[in-house]
Amino acid sequence: SDQILAYSAHFDHIGSTDKSGDNIYNGADDNASGVTLMIGISDYFKSTEPAFSMMYMAFNGEEKGMKGSKAIAENHLLKDKHAKISALFNFEMVATVSQFGPNALYMTGAEFSDLDELLNANAAAGLKVHPDPYIGQQLFYRSDNVSFVKKKIIAHSFSTVDMNVAKHYHQLNDDINVVNFDNLTGLINSFGKTFQKLTPENFTPQYNDKVSFK
C-alpha cells in the first residue's frame, strides 16, 4: 500500500549520577519497554502481510527535548514518506499493567482525534485503548509524537504507566523488576492482531479542530 502506519519509541534515558553504588538510570520502563513493543510488532509482521506499508522509527534525544524525532520529522528527504503516514503510534512507558487492567493502555491527546475510536472498533485479542486519564499533565505535547503533530500527521503516544503513583519515573529503580513481561507480551500480540485488521478503507483517522499544531 502507498499508505503507511508508523511506529516509534525513544531509546535514550537520562544517564547516570555521580553517586557511588548503583548510579545508572536503566530506563527499563522509560523507554526500553516502548522499544520492545515496537520491535515486537515488527516481528509479528515478519510472517504476516499487512494491508498498510509499515515504518519503524527509534529516536534518540527524547529526554533532551525530543531531538531525534524532531530531526526525522523535519528531514526534507523524508517529506514524501511523511505525506503517506495515516497514523503514527508512539510507545512510551508500557512496562506495567495500566490502571485499566491487563491488555489496556491510554492514548495521549484522545480529545484531538478519532484514532482511539477507530482502534477500539477494530481491536483484537482484548486490546482496549482509553483516553489519557492524566490530561492535566499535557502528556500529548511531552513525547516524540508531538514532532509529527507539528507536521499535521496523526500522531499519538500510548502508555500504561500510572503517572499519579509511579515511583520509578526518572529514578534509579526503573529497572527490569518494573517490567510485567506477561502484559507486555500480550500487548505485542494484541496490537499485532489489531493492526493486521486495519486497511486504508476502514482506517482513516482525522484530527478535529481542538488540536494545536504549534
Residue ranges and their predicted role:
Residues 1-57, 77:
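Catalytic-core environment of secreted peptidases
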Residues 25-36, 48, 63-67, 109-113, ...:
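Soluble non-cytosolic domains of exported or imported proteins
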Residues 13-19, 97-100, 164-169:
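Short acidic/His/Gly/Ser-rich catalytic and metal-binding motifs that mark active-site loops
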Residues 51-59, 88-91, 204-214:
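Acidic/histidine-enriched alpha-helical segments
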Residues 8, 35, 39-42, 66-73, ...:
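Extracytoplasmic/secreted envelope proteins and their assembly/folding machinery
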Residues 59-163:
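Metal-dependent peptidase/peptidase-like ectodomains
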Residues 40-50, 74-78, 120, 124-127, ...:
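Sec-exported extracytoplasmic/periplasmic mature domains
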Residues 43, 160, 165-214:
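His/Asp/Glu-rich mid-to-C-terminal helical/loop segments that flank catalytic regions of hydrolases
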